[in-house]
């Protein structure tokens, strides 16, 4: 048998073991102090430890801007910056704010700076939170606000004089001093206005009232006259059940249901557009052509007077993407341009990022992103007839993000990687004339230049803020793996530094014992394509040693996950625990292989119809190359872990390469595609291949997904595999892990299963039980050591 851990049955976790074989246990087991050292550098404990790592500017009409920061004690401050004078001034000290608001029963730490407005004699600072309070600056006089403060779940108008909320599945409009009125009618469960739909994978917390959210997929026109949004229809979808086995204050399990169309279901989410004239309440409902959907990550792209622009897509074959114009007064829809491809179509090299598209009001012009030449570049398009007036950027490199457009100066600002060669994931800053001409480098020096590019619609749809409204300045955060972030104000005409805004305080990170990783350039399995990896070395690594190696993988086609900046390396989106595992004696490697985003289209499309298979080929090739560069790596002891698509990939690694990968931890894995969500909005058929609507075969699995099901390879398992799932995970439903477990049972393969009660998809970041078991699993089965008998501290945001 495997040597089991001491039996423990905590309230929210039970380990079910199906075990055989025997692991060699080292005579020198790890100590509790080793785990404590690993804890200190865990991503969740270090989140926020890197103080003032970035600056989000809030621009005023006069060209100044303000931003928030933390002082040396972690208290919030606000700074006012005058770019013309190259000066910054703290608007308030925390102690002064405390004193000023105390007479009104408020305390500074419980207030949030909601807005700053210029007045004749200075500024008005509006605070929300414990109490609505207005403060005058520089006189620093505070008083309770006389104006109604928008609630936290409100969507404010551009002028700030009205806001939207969702009530009873409809949008309601309110202004200070006036009663709220319904702006839409006819909303109903599963087909509301501004309601967060279940396809966003947050249905359970929304139903529980734990997620007050602003109106979803809704936006104002710049002049505040119109409200436009996307209406989702989930009424025809089947109910999908989740069983909460240990609900609070009850011994009776509770069933939650959400609306979910899985791959191959005849009914999937449908969407339409609507526009409401706020002045007279006139509403236009726009039905999309059959088979077309609004591109879910794009939403509404922009406005030009009374004309709205959006991107919609059709995922038949070939796949088609359209830029469309909708007249707000009549609801008439017109196609501006159309692109097609047999694989993916998207408006950014990363589909999770905001579309690299800008509508230029009054110019009959759009800056449009396209991969039509095989890379990812910007084009100037005439809106009146869809004619491409010119390709603005070009070359064997890809635009990363469109940072803003200075219409008056006729410049488009963007970030890109690999323009001058080198690491294609390291961003530089550039601009290009709207009417054509050479690309001008503003900042590209080998360090990464992160400029706020806004967020995609699925993550709130916020517009970029880094470029000043007048186009004269950019806010740029400069960093590398070894260098903490430094945020500067940069002149947009030549890229010169105007002033330093913040130098991040990394003292808490360093004190915790965190060490920067290394960057390596490698070759893919084809022997030609450069790929890149980030490596976390054990503290005591030496070339004459023998250190096991762990492949820390995500691999989803939406992003890349090998860090290139200090902040990413300290506390990552996915995967986490890399620095922690290095402290436990493992070399930990993250690789951006073929099939992930950020590069050219062919590189990205390697995962189309193949999911993680090409990536795993590249990972094996890369690890073998690293074994030649780092003689201390023991390639007879290779492990892998991942979460979500990374969980799928980790399990698949042990099943496709059973003699190479010996130990794996797969949490919240999307182990088959037929059990995942389908459809055009963000379904597996859209992301990884096939023609919509996906039609099941006689076996119930739509082609071409049968070969991507991990269960089909269950008989190949030879190593140690720990499967992990949270019972309320809407992103990767628990059934997917249990279906793989059933296939492993049928094949009489041994594995381990960790069930986490009340947990959702965040378990890999916030669950100490998962983290503990994952570390133990690699220590016992890969390092051959006995884990210490210790308990990890709770992680921030973990389950109660």
Could you tell me what each predicted segment is?
Residues 63, 305, 311, 409, ...:
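Serine-hydrolase catalytic core recognition
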Residues 1-7:
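N-terminal secretory signal peptides that target proteins for export/translocation
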Residues 4, 36, 500-501:
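Hydrophobic alpha-helical segments with strong N-terminal bias
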Residues 9, 13, 23, 27-460, ...:
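Beta-propeller folds
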């Amino acid at each position: 048998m495997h040597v089991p851990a001491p039996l423990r049955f905590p309230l929210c976790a039970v380990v079910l073991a199906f075990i055989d074989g025997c692991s060699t246990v080292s005579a020198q087991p790890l100590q509790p102090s080793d785990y404590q050292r690993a804890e200190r550098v865990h991503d969740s404990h270090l989140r926020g430890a890197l103080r003032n790592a970035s600056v989000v500017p809030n621009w005023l009409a006069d060209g100044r801007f303000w931003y928030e920061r933390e002082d040396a004690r972690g208290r919030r401050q606000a700074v006012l910056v005058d770019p013309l004078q190259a000066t910054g001034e703290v608007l308030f000290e925390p102690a002064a704010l405390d004193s000023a608001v105390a007479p009104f029963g408020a305390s500074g730490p419980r207030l949030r700076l909601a807005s700053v407005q210029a007045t004749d004699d200075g500024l008005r600072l509006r605070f929300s939170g414990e109490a609505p309070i207005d403060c005058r600056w520089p006189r620093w006089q505070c008083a309770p606000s006389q104006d109604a403060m928008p609630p936290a779940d409100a969507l404010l108008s551009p002028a700030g004089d009205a806001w939207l909320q969702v009530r009873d599945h409809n949008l309601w409009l309110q202004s200070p001093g006036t009663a709220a009125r319904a702006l839409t009618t006819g909303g109903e469960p599963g087909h509301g206005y501004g309601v967060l739909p279940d396809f966003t994978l947050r249905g359970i917390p929304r139903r529980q009232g734990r997620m007050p959210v602003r109106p979803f997929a809704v936006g104002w026109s710049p002049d505040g006259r119109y409200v436009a949004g996307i209406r989702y229809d989930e009424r025809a979808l089947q109910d999908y059940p989740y069983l909460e086995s240990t609900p609070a204050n009850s011994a009776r399990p509770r069933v939650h249901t959400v609306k979910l169309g899985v791959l191959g279901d005849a009914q999937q989410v449908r969407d339409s557009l609507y526009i409401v004239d706020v002045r007279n309440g006139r509403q236009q409902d726009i039905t999309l052509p059959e088979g077309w959907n609004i591109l879910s990550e794009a939403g509404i792209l922009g406005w030009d007077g009374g004309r709205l622009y959006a991107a919609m897509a059709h995922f038949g074959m070939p796949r088609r993407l359209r830029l469309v114009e909708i007249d707000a007064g009549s609801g008439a829809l017109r196609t501006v341009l159309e692109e097609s491809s047999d694989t993916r179509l998207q408006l950014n090299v990363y589909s999770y990022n905001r579309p690299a598209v800008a509508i230029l009001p009054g110019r009959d012009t759009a800056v449009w992103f396209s991969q039509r030449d095989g890379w990812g570049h910007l084009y100037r398009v005439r809106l009146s007839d869809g004619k491409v007036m010119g390709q603005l950027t070009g070359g064997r490199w890809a635009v990363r993000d469109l940072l803003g457009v200075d219409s008056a100066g006729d410049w488009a600002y963007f970030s890109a990687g690999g323009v001058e060669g080198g690491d294609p994931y390291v961003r530089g800053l550039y601009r290009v004339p709207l009417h054509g001409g050479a690309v001008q480098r503003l900042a590209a020096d080998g360090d990464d230049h992160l400029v706020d590019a806004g967020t995609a619609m699925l993550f709130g749809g916020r517009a970029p803020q880094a470029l000043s409204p007048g186009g004269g300045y950019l806010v740029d955060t400069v960093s590398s793996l070894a260098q903490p972030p430094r945020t500067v104000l940069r002149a947009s005409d030549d890229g010169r530094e105007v002033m330093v805004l913040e130098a991040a305080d990394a003292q808490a990170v360093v004190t915790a014992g965190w060490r920067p990783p290394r960057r390596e350039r490698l070759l893919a399995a084809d022997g030609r394509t450069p790929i890149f990896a980030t490596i976390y070395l054990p503290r005591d690594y030496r070339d004459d040693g023998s250190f096991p190696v762990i492949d820390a993988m995500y691999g989803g086609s939406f992003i890349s996950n090998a860090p290139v900046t200090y902040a990413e390396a300290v506390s990552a989106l996915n995967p986490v625990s890399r620095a922690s595992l290095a402290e436990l004696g493992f070399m930990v490697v993250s690789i951006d292989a073929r099939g992930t985003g950020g590069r050219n289209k062919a590189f990205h499309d390697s995962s189309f119809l193949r999911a993680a298979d090409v990536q795993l080929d590249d990972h094996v090739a890369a690890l073998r190359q690293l074994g030649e560069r780092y003689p201390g790596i023991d390639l007879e002891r290779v492990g892998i872990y991942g979460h979500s698509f990374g969980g799928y990939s980790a399990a698949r690694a042990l099943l496709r390469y059973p003699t190479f990968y010996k130990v794996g931890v797969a949490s919240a894995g999307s182990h088959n595609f037929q059990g995942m969500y389908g459809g055009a909005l963000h379904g597996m058929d859209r992301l990884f291949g096939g023609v919509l609507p996906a039609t099941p075969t006689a076996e119930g699995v739509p082609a071409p997904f049968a070969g991507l099901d991990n269960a089909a390879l269950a008989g190949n398992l030879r190593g140690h595999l720990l499967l992990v799932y949270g019972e309320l995970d809407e992103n990767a439903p628990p059934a997917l892990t249990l279906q793989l477990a059933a296939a492993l049972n049928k094949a009489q393969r041994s594995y381990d299963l960790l069930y986490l009660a009340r947990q959702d998809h965040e378990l890999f970041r916030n669950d100490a039980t998962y983290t503990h078991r994952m570390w133990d699993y690699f220590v016992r089965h890969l390092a051959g050591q006995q884990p210490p008998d210790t308990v990890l501290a709770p992680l921030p945001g973990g389950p109660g």
